[in-house]
Amino acid sequence: IYAVFNEKTTIDANEVRYLAKTAQARGVDSAGIVFQTNNDLQIIKRDFGSLELIGKTKNFSNSKFIAGHSRLVTNDVKNNQPVVKEELIVIHNGIITNYLEIWESIGLKPETELDSELIPVLFDHFTKKGLSDDDVVNEIFNICEGVISAILIAPRSNKVHLISNNGSLYYGYKEDSFYVASESYPLTSMSLDGVTQVFGLFSYDYNFNFAEILVDDVITKKRNYLLPKFEFMSSRDKLLERPEHDLKRCKKCILPETMPYITFDEYGVCNYCNNYTLKNIPKPVSVLESLMEPYRRKGSRDCIVPFSGGRDSSYGLHLIVEELGMNPIAYTYDWGMVTDLGRRNISRMCSKLKVENIIVAADITKKRDNIRKNVTAWLKNPHLGMISLWTAGDKHFFRYCEDVKKETGISLNLW
């Protein structure tokens, strides 16, 4: 997400290009912008990156404001941001994982399969009940699971609402201009004043003075690497066998009786546990806590935690926040093999723990093509020792982790 607002003069095109370029770190498959042309609010959505979109939109620099988005396309070909609903314009980062249940609970039906559509609907729904803007946002956060970091433009009430339940949204000022970005680095690198992280709601007054909202959405690319839509087929489901297993397991490590060479003693403990020799002496947690002390920053982020959304990294993030009391930024490298479930877990964990999530996305088309080549090459002469070829594409993970540390000024990353 990026945005610039100025009521006195037109926006600086070079600043917009810079913000659009930094936004592309989250993906270049799809982009969208909203800006003012004469008396109308113009929304343009395309299936390429934000910098290219800005370059092909010649009249954006005549506007006094612009807000945009750049994203990775994983399972939907639609250029879905910004979202327009109830005369509200929303640009959203994150995933609302329980959006279908919420639609059912409020007795309304979605027009699209997009979870972000729910944000303006809920904002309008609770506003009509007479709630204040702060209470409306709190209600949205209370019923939604997953990350919500969004710009919500309410042109009829001349308001720009910044909302975030995990801190992945920042704003700053320079002279008469107001700037917004998903991360702090683009704003601090522009030497803005008062760069602030959003938790909850921050509202900015802006006089839009418009007639109508125009939407220009064009899809030109056919993407054959997206996740197929799940379709339940009862005829195929009947072919599946789901036998109930009653396996004997080790009382300590839960290894099953199907494990090669396993035996159990009279207490139900396996031979692997009985013969295990401790390789080192675990130190108490207090030692780890003392190692963290020099890195702690009261009230600000103090470490980077690489985060895939899997079981191990999710538990690790929980320990770092809840047990060690650190204030991390979760860093995710999406290289084409992060699953849809992984992305949803990332959204759930970061919202629950109120952890900012910085996402760096690869060129998915190229990455998946390389993965296919590596797997094909391995299959010609399969060997267990060479199976690491399958994950060769994720090694940029380490490089971008160092970039994130430099941009945030954080020297510690915890694995």
Predicted regions and their residues:
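ATP-dependent adenylation/nucleotidyltransferase module used to activate substrates
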Residues: 247-415
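Short Cys/His-rich Zn2+-coordinating modules
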Residues: 227-238, 253-256
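Conserved short alpha-helical segments that host acidic/polar catalytic motifs at enzyme active sites
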Residues: 1-227
